[in-house]
């Protein structure tokens, strides 16, 4: 069978089976409208019904409930306490002080938890918004120039961009491209404006030239990266543009395609995967290449089995070279050889950083991205107080931290004082804590199998104790991440130690990632308790402290010492 016929057979669906029900849902949704308006008017239930439960994701929301009280409500013959989580669309994570004060006020007055959550998608989330407040939420955001279009669902989601503040023209150029890519790949339907902003209902076909009438087979994630920083974790994303500069000016991008971390417990046809390097493209071809990758995945992705619908599986099914050739054909280009670059670090530089324009930037470590007023540490109030006087902007990072960017010299002391008074600067935070993160998980995430955000702080304290026990200096820390389920939001599958929730109090224990985020870790122990994990870490760190080579990271040591095998090709090696 020729390559062309083989590809056509794959695309026709004859090898992939009947379409998943989500494809019917999207096709019948009237371009993402469904019957969401009718559901909003239904006060009998606090949730969304039938297809609308899925459709609201395309509008940036997930239906959730408080799982801590789910059983008690069931005893009382009550439905779960339904609410929504909203994820804002903020390409590059930049938000103004005026916008910040507005979202702070909304979170305080109209959410069940009174918090703001910075996320690994370089944006913020509201948690615990009840149905009567949903429309107000969207209208509040719209009034300050923010929306949540396409931050969830089978579309291109919030575009990430390296967040270190404007230290060069290159950073600003990269951010501008992140915005352009985001706008270019957005859904064109007017459903969002009609439903949430009371927009005029126009007679229109709502054609989707890039996403198509059935949108994408699965979610799609895009980044813009400035080497050597890999804060956005390129290998967690479907499409990555690696900025290539000449004399400090952006000249184009190396394009990496097919990364992704989600998998399904017990299903060896699912796995985390590094992205493949397609080559270099000049700036003027950036949007054409972005659209070509998206439309190729749109047409070739698996619409039968959603567990195998991501771009990474399409590449492994049809072949990287075949996929790349189709992208070249659609974009009208030939990829050039990749330009040299190196990714060496992922962490945010916490503290003050000087910009080239005489301004200063303060990166604040926000553990797990949760901004809340804790006893003795009113973090959320602290950021709001800074916003009241700040003349620059804020930058949310993909590590769930916050940068106060563009601070003039005369305001440095005042802003630092506010930050310290509210616990936003804590000199007691170790490097280990700064290099650890978790997804939300319980009590709000419906997919969580184990704790993550609530589990991480105390467990990191215990890891700190292990490092101290083995006389390791502060700089010798471990990239440690926890996710409550195998869907990958906490990016644990690019950590030196990654814990994946399996059941309450139990995790799959992965080892062997590296500090730069360019290697997938391998499972070391399955379904073990946190106490067992800590015991294993104690033993392994002891070996690392005594057996390592000079400047050898923990993940590199576990590979060299034969504790786990290196994952080079995920499809072949991850479960081997």
Curated annotation (Swiss-Prot):
Pathway: Sulfur metabolism; hydrogen sulfide biosynthesis; hydrogen sulfide from sulfite (NADPH route): step 1/1
Enzyme class: oxidoreductase
An example Gene Ontology CC term for this record: sulfite reductase complex (NADPH)
GO molecular function: 4 iron, 4 sulfur cluster binding; heme binding; metal ion binding; NADP binding; sulfite reductase (ferredoxin) activity; sulfite reductase (NADPH) activity
An individual GO BP term: sulfate assimilation
Residues engaged in binding siroheme: 489
Keyword Amino-acid biosynthesis: yes
HAMAP family, per the entry: CysI (MF_01540)
Description of how the protein assembles with itself and partners: Alpha(8)-beta(8). The alpha component is a flavoprotein, the beta component is a hemoprotein.
Protein name: Sulfite reductase [NADPH] hemoprotein beta-component
